[in-house]
Amino acid sequence: MSPEHQATQKVAQRLVDLCSVGKNLDALKELYADSARHVEVMEGPGCARIIEGKKTLLEKAEKFAKTTQIHSASCGKPMVNGDQFVCQMSLDCTASEGPMANQRMTMSEVALYTVKNGKITEGKFFYSMGC
């Protein structure tokens, strides 16, 4: 196993460990590069498709935490390939704002992360849009 693979595995496992116990904000603070970005499938209400910078990602995550009741969450075992890893994530929640306000929903996605110098530099998220 290459040093790059080992470093990515370490970051991947730490992300899963934190997210599995609801410490998503801690994961962002600890594991993300300052210049990290997220790429979503599409824009959402009040949310751009591409979000740049750790500070902006933290602001988005903090708003989500304040406006969403989490009933349960899960994060699958990470699968690593070089400087990237994927994992399956699920969330059972009720939003207090937006088009899905007060409706309980289950969200499931596959996340593809890229790691450079021991930090997550990009997260791409894949999910079905009900098509």
Regions found by a protein language model. Give the residues of each.
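Short beta-strand edge/turn micro-motifs at domain boundaries
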Residues: 106-131
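A short hydrophobic beta-strand element
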Residues: 81-93
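A solvent-exposed, acidic/Ser-Thr-rich amphipathic alpha-helical stretch
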Residues: 5-6, 25, 29-82
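Short, cysteine-centered beta-strand-loop-beta hairpins and adjacent loop/turn segments enriched
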Residues: 66-69, 93-105
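Basic/polar N-terminal segments that are highly enriched at the extreme N-terminus
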Residues: 1-10, 131
